């Protein structure tokens, strides 16, 4: 049963934004957004790629390319901002490549609240509805490409002894199904 809930990729984007506000200062981030909109949008597009196809294991390190315009907005003081932040042990910055390096655990924290809410909603659905006959679940949509979300859902399905189907291209699965149904109406 498809359902739109307010705990998808946008909430993860909000956590990402908040991380940079905490790290570099909300005023500077707002200035970057207002004065360098193209770079700001590109910065979040790149995060979208990391979010969907990013690391699948906790051993990996995450690299985030900082746009030159953001670096300039901060008056080249990113290392100092990091050293004064609560993230000083989890984040470092390479001035030559303009890359912020963070451990996987910190990256995973962007998803914590979203995962908690999705899990809670699924458990509530099982409790409120008679879903004891459900033996298979289908995970589709762009957000389901994210390894962190996949792992959380896989773990929950395993607990509930439900077989999980994850198509090769989950972001396109709904579209492909709609096109197929439109061309072969008796397929439903």
Where do the protein language model's features map onto the residues?
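Conserved A3 ("GATE") glycine/threonine-rich loop of ANL adenylate-forming enzymes
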Residues: 6-14, 168-182
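Gly/charged contiguous loops adjacent to phosphate- or pyrophosphate-bearing nucleotide/cofactor binding elements
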Residues: 4-152
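Active-site catalytic pocket residues across diverse enzymes, especially alpha/beta-hydrolases
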Residues: 20, 153, 157, 182
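Conserved phosphate-binding/catalytic loops in two-lobed NTP-binding clefts
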Residues: 153-177
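Short beta-alpha connecting loops at secondary-structure transitions
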Residues: 2-5, 30, 159-166
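A polyampholytic, Gly/Pro-enriched intrinsically disordered region
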Residues: 182-188
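A long, glycine-enriched binding/interface module in the latter
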Residues: 37, 171, 188
């Amino acid at each position: 049963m498809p359902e739109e809930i307010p705990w998808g990729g946008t909430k993860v984007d909000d956590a990402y934004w908040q991380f940079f506000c905490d790290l570099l200062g909300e005023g500077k981030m707002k200035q970057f957004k207002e004065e360098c909109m193209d770079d700001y949008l590109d910065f979040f597009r790149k995060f979208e790629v990391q979010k969907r196809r990013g690391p699948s294991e906790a051993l990996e390190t995450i690299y985030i390319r900082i746009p030159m315009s953001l670096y300039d907005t901060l008056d080249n003081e990113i290392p100092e901002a990091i050293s004064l932040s609560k993230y000083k042990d989890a984040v470092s910055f390479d001035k030559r490549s303009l890359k912020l390096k963070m451990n996987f655990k910190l990256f995973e924290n962007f998803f914590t609240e979203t995962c908690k809410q999705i899990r809670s909603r699924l458990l509530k659905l099982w409790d409120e509805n008679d879903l004891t006959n459900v033996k298979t679940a289908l995970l589709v949509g762009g957000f389901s490409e994210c390894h962190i979300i996949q792992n959380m859902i896989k773990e929950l399905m395993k607990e509930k002894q439900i077989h999980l189907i994850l198509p090769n291209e989950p972001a396109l699965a709904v579209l492909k199904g709609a096109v197929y149904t439109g061309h072969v109406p008796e397929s439903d």
